[in-house]
Amino acid sequence: MKKIFVSVASYQDPLLLETLCSAYENAEYKENLIFGVCEQSSSGIDLNSIRFQDQIRYELLDPVMAKGPCYARSRIQSFIKDEDYYLQIDSHMIFAKGWDSLLLTYLDWIYEQTNINSIITGYPRSFK
């Protein structure tokens, strides 16, 4: 299976770690995920506490120096290496089981119908 680069820009978001763990735990092919994280926070997440830390490319920026989500996302793009797919998410999300396989299956189906590469976009539901 191909690699998915998951881009996460975060500004002082207490749900960042929960989001990363949800994406990882609910993926069918965990080994194919690479996370690019730009955290704009006064205290970053403890990467040593994350068992998949070797799959995270991480930068911590002082929130005083923050220049918004577009700036953080541009920093994250420098973390991309040879991954096949790019998924940009918010830092406060919960993932469904098998989300990675579902997205790739959907992309393959779109390509079969249209013979062009596509972009899937959406706005996630809120949660409590």
Which functions belong to the PLM regions below?
Residues M1-K128:
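Catalytic cores of eukaryotic secretory-pathway lumenal/extracellular enzymes that build
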